[in-house]
Amino acid sequence: MATMRKLVMKGPKESEIITVERPVINKPTEVLVKLHYCGVCMSEHYDWTTAPAGRTFGHEPMGTVVEVGEGVTRVKVGDRVSMGAGGGAEYQKLDEKWVHKIPDNVEDHQGIIEPLWCLVSAVSKVRLPIQSEKVAVVGCGYMGCGAISLLAMRGVKVVAVDINPESLKNALKYGACEAYLPEELPEEYITTRNTYKGVDVDSAVKNAASTGFPLVMEWGETAESLDLAIRMTRQCGQLAIGAYHTGGKRLVDVQLLNVRAIDCLSTHPREQDLNFRSAECAMRMLGDDTWSYKHVPTKVYPASMFDKAHEELEIKFGKWMKAVIDWENEDFEPYIIND
């Protein structure tokens, strides 16, 4: 019986590597992939802190096809592929429809497709203003900067906001035209609750239509960033929420969301057809350099240091933007790929 290593949780914040049976192809359209990398996603961080025994993680894997069923036509043995689940072990078996081939000019760590298709899907859903108008992105980590790069490609000017100065530098690097700490935002970028009492109505209406942004994308996930994003959205504008995945409830100003008639859009990727098309689109754009979001500082950890990778998510700012675990190599000191 062939075996493989698998990462499972022993409890909150504590994982272990166990040995299990390697999956075997038993359907004609299945492929077997030997993993190289799996991304460490912030959306799993809260669940990692509260994980019960036996819980597994890893939805950002990539690797090499080592075996295919007799009916497989999309990929062949030796192809590098990425997918959206099953990154918690050395090998993964899945139907060929769930794998996406990585272009030859894209490095392994650059070809982790799941977060990239989430970005393409999210930006495809938003209501963009005309070219050269300003939109805002609140939260400028890996996902926020990816969204900034795509929005800039679409011809709008992006104003970036984050609580970390290092993240603002990244935002400017990936396409933002302006970048601010929350307390430094210009007055005209923040909307106010207007009751129309004691003011000229025409002036009030004009002010409501000119302050804030017609589109704000939120990638910070905290109550503070969500609340700020609401206050930055113009009357009748659109607030696109991309990062609120896990954790408890958030206390935000829903009243302002309502009285300003803000269109609130969840960009969470739940449409399988759109996810597939977004993944294929992302791979094409990376392959032909239409989308230059490949050169992202990435820290690599051995699978045995999965917990350390999560611990360091909160101190990465200004040092690296993305973390991955390496299933091919063991017992090495974590290092940063800064290309």
Model region roles, listed by residue range:
Residues K6, E30, E60-M62, R80, ...:
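Residue-level marker of beta-strand positions
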Residues V199-K206, G248-T298, K308:
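C-terminal substrate-binding/catalytic core of Rossmann-like NAD(P)-dependent dehydrogenases/reductases
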Residues T233-R250, L265:
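ADP-ribose/adenylate-binding Rossmann-like module
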Residues R80-V138:
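NAD(P)H dinucleotide-binding glycine-rich loop of Rossmann-like/cofactor-binding domains
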